[in-house]
């Protein structure tokens, strides 16, 4: 499990959370 993969996954989760909660 590489840090780069974790970073990308984190950004994806952030974007999903932003889209769902409308808190950007």
Swiss-Prot record:
Disulfide bonds join 18-24. GO terms for cellular component: extracellular region. The keyword Mitochondrion does not apply. InterPro entries: Antimicrobial_frog_1. Pfam families: Antimicrobial_1 (PF08018). Keywords: Amphibian defense peptide, Antibiotic, Antimicrobial, Disulfide bond, Secreted. It comes from the Eukaryota. It is found in: Secreted. Signal peptide: none annotated. One of its GO terms (biological process) is defense response to bacterium. Expressed by the skin glands. Antibacterial activity against Gram-negative bacterium E.coli. Belongs to the frog skin active peptide (FSAP) family. Brevinin subfamily. This is Brevinin-1Sc. It comes from Lithobates sphenocephalus (Southern leopard frog).
């Amino acid at each position: 499990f590489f840090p780069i993969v974790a970073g990308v996954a984190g950004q994806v989760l952030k974007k999903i959370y932003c889209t769902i909660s409308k808190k950007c």
